[in-house]
Amino acid sequence: MQDSQYYRENKNLWFDDSSAFTLENLKEKVVSATKECGLFLWRSGKCLTKENLLELSNTLGTALNQSAQGCEVFEVKDEGYEKTDPRFRGPSSNRQLTFHTDRCDLLLFHCIRQASEGGVNLFVHSETIYSILEEESPELLKVLEENFLYKRHNADPANPLSYYELPVFGDKKERVITLMTWLIEQAHQDSELPNLSELQLKSLVKIQEICQRKEVHLEVSLKPGDLLFLNNLQMLHSRTAFEASGDRLYYRVWLAVPWSVELPDSFEELFGATAAGAVRGGFKKF
């Protein structure tokens, strides 16, 4: 099971604070670590500009749009928007986030400034979640392998679909996972769409409860210059709330990578392509 104990015992697999990387061996390490244990953290000690970060990212894969305007390097910081503001997005707030996935194969965070208090990153491997559900709640695991309705994201106006359907666990062999609870909740609140069943509601609560367990998730406090690469198809991530002082700033890149696995057909509406190694994910440009 890939739990927090596993990450403590195998830190050499996913962590490196060496300055001896070249682009070639960095890529090799990222591919190996994200396949093996889902993430790789490099303490580079150097903050990159957006341009340099994008150059590095493009040696690994294809940077994807993270907004309708075509943003490829997204600033994760507290913008002070209220939740009712149409510009509101979870990463643009200082709130604690639920465990979730994004819209890419590989997710890259680059820490520019850490919060004075809070803002700790949390990670859980899908294998861990699956195993616990198999043992504790097999009836809910079955529900999570069926489709949930998702409302279109407010940052995705170019998408012609107002909603789409997707399972949380989409592939048993690869343990592919996708979860964006807030879009499921928005679909649930839409009077024109069917409500979630009682079992679906219970399954969403259960998966968050599992991820919140101290013995399950890995906690990582990023430092300025850190580069964290995450297998977005096998890892859920979250972060704790942080002081709304305006200090915390991460750069985020979504990547489609050539070593990605084939996705189930049900993922086509969200990712646009399902073939292994395809350029897929992100938002359509408006």
Residue ranges, per PLM feature:
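Active-site environment of non-heme Fe oxygenases that use a 2-His-1-carboxylate facial triad
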Residues: 1-22, 28, 35, 70-224, ...
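Long, mid-chain structured domain cores
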Residues: 31, 35-72
